Every structure is written in structure tokens, then in C-alpha cells.
């Protein structure tokens, strides 16, 4: 009976984790409808908040935070064109995160990392095949996959439950997400926990996870993902000076050296660097953050600052 309870709890938590990360841009919200997905996450979150009476002090503080977040969103809605659905959408995310953690706090991080690991492994394999044989090598299965909206006269993406074939980013690994930037956020989170929480897994498992997360992050060709890798590695090497985990430190150093050699000495690595760095901020011969996707970010930041200054 105890085994059945543990197994059921494990399955439920994996399901909650999948739905939790689906809110970051996977296909499930669009497949069942965004409004239905918001209602689903709210009900799932509320169910486990009310069902289990553990973590009382944490729950009291966290629910207070969610309540304050919801009412602050309502104040924004009153003075804008946003709807109540926006407030529910924003508050449903921290609620489902807390409920997922509360199901089994002791195994939450391990299961989160394992699920991301298998998603990353699948994405690396499928992305490698598309790079070798072409994006259309899977065209025969596209009609059987979930199709997203149309953009520029063609379907934006196919799939999205475990892997997504995104036509706009056919040369980048988006994982099950609609954009590589969304995917790198999840990968960077998993990489952080596996690097800075050594007690979660044995050393061999950690090395295996780190290598897969590194490879997946590199193939996203996400500038923010590359910046995240640099920051995580720099902080880890400083942190590891006080630890005795020599094997992990050497594994990361070897991975970094291998990545640098790949980027600098292979044609594919040079293409990656051109996509991530030069085409985004250095295309006109000088440093310019207004180019391509960098422009979308800097323009929005400058617009917000201008609005604050004028009002």
C-alpha cells in the first residue's frame, strides 16, 4: 500500500511538473485553449493547497504573496485595457509551482531535473537529425503533429509536447517550446540546480546531466542562454574553490574547453557564433544592440523608461 502511494505521488508530481513548465510556452496551453489551461492550473493549484496541510508556515507566506500579486494585478486592470484573465494567468503560475512542490518536497528538484533531462536529450537527438538531413526530413509526420498558428503564409511550428519543429527557427533547438529563448530559461534553471545542489544526485549522474544541458543550451543559439552559461560557470568555479568536488570541477572545465574548440574550429560552431553574437549586435561593423532581436528588447526597455520619465 505504501509503495502504491509513493508511485502514485511520483506520477502525479511528474504530471504537475510537466504542466508547470508547459506554461512557459509549450503546446499544451494552445492545444486545450489558453483560458482552459488557466482554469486547469488554478484548479490543480488550489486542490493541492487545500488538500495537504503540511508546510504551514511556508504556505501562509506564499499564499499571502500570491494574494498580494493578484490584487496588485487588479489595480493595474482597473486603469488599463487588460482583463481579469490576465490577473488569473499571472497568479496561476506561482500557484501551480507551489502546488507542484508541495506534492512531494523531498523529490521535487530531482524529478524536475530528470524531466528536463529527458526533454533535452530528445531535443538534441531530433535537432541533430534535422541539422544533418534537413528540416524537412520529418515532413512526413508533420500532418500528424499539432500545428500552431500561421505566420507569413506558413505554419509556425509542428508539435510542442516533447519537441517542436519551428519553421522560423529551423536551425535552432527550441525543444518543446515555440522559441529558443523560452527553452533556454528552463534549461538554465535545471543547470543551476544540478551545479549548485550536489546532494541531489551522484557525481556520475550530475556529470551526465550537465553535459546534456550544456549541449542543449548551445544548440538553442540563444544569446541570453549563452550569457547564462557564462554566469553559471563563473559562479560555480568561484564556489567550487571551497569544495572538494574535484571531478565535477574538471568535468565542467573539460566541457568548457571542448565547447570553445567546437565554436572556434568547426564550421557549425562558427555558424552558431554568427547567429548568436555577430548577426544580433555586430552586423554593421560596430557594437549595436538595436539589431534584430536585440532591437526588440532594447526598444521595449527604452520605451518603458521614456513613459516613466514623461508621466
Task: Go through each PLM region and give its residues.
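N-terminal signal-anchor transmembrane segment
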Residues: 1-54, 70-77
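Membrane-interfacial loop-to-transmembrane alpha-helix junctions, especially the N-terminal start
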Residues: 3-15, 53-67, 109-115, 205-208
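Juxtamembrane membrane-water interface segments that cap and precede transmembrane helices
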Residues: 19-26, 159-176, 295-301
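Transmembrane alpha-helical segments and their membrane-water interfaces
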Residues: 45-51, 76-133
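Membrane-interfacial entry segments at the cytosolic side of transmembrane helices
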Residues: 107-116, 204-207, 242-255
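Alpha-helical transmembrane segments of multi-pass inner-membrane proteins
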Residues: 113-137, 160-221, 226-239
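A membrane-periplasm/extracellular boundary helix in multi-pass inner-membrane enzymes
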Residues: 125, 129-134, 240-287
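TM-adjacent membrane-interface loops and short helices in multi-pass inner/ER membrane proteins
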Residues: 286-311
Amino acid at each position: 500500500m505504501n509503495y502504491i502511494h509513493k508511485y502514485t505521488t511520483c506520477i502525479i508530481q511528474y504530471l504537475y511538473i510537466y504542466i508547470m513548465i508547459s506554461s512557459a510556452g509549450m503546446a499544451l496551453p494552445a492545444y486545450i485553449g489558453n483560458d482552459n489551461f488557466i482554469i486547469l492550473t488554478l484548479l490543480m493549484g488550489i486542490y493541492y493547497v487545500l488538500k495537504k496541510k503540511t508546510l504551514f508556515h511556508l504556505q501562509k507566506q506564499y499564499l499571502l504573496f500570491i494574494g498580494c500579486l493578484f490584487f496588485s494585478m487588479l489595480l493595474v486592470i482597473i486603469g488599463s485595457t487588460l482583463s481579469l484573465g490576465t490577473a488569473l494567468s499571472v497568479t496561476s503560475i506561482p500557484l501551480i509551482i507551489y502546488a507542484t512542490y508541495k506534492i512531494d518536497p523531498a523529490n521535487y528538484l530531482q524529478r524536475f531535473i530528470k524531466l528536463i533531462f529527458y526533454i533535452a536529450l530528445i531535443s538534441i537527438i531530433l535537432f541533430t537529425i534535422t541539422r544533418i538531413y534537413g528540416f524537412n526530413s520529418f515532413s512526413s509526420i508533420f500532418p500528424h503533429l499539432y500545428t500552431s498558428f500561421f505566420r507569413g503564409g506558413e505554419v509556425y511550428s509542428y508539435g510542442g509536447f516533447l519537441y517542436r519543429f519551428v519553421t522560423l527557427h529551423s536551425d535552432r533547438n527550441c525543444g518543446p517550446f515555440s522559441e529558443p529563448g523560452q527553452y533556454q530559461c528552463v534549461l538554465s534553471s535545471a543547470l543551476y540546480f544540478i551545479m549548485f545542489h550536489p546532494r541531489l544526485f551522484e557525481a556520475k549522474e550530475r556529470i551526465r546531466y550537465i553535459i546534456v544541458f550544456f549541449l542543449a543550451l548551445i544548440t538553442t543559439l540563444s544569446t541570453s542562454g549563452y550569457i547564462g552559461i557564462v554566469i553559471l560557470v563563473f559562479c560555480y568555479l568561484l564556489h567550487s574553490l571551497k569544495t572538494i568536488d574535484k571531478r565535477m570541477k574538471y568535468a565542467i572545465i573539460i566541457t568548457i574547453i571542448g565547447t570553445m574548440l567546437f565554436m572556434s574550429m568547426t564550421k557549425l560552431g562558427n555558424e552558431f557564433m554568427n547567429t548568436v553574437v555577430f548577426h544580433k549586435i555586430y552586423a554593421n561593423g560596430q557594437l549595436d544592440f538595436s539589431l534584430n532581436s536585440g532591437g526588440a528588447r532594447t526598444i521595449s526597455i527604452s520605451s518603458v523608461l521614456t513613459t516613466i520619465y514623461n508621466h
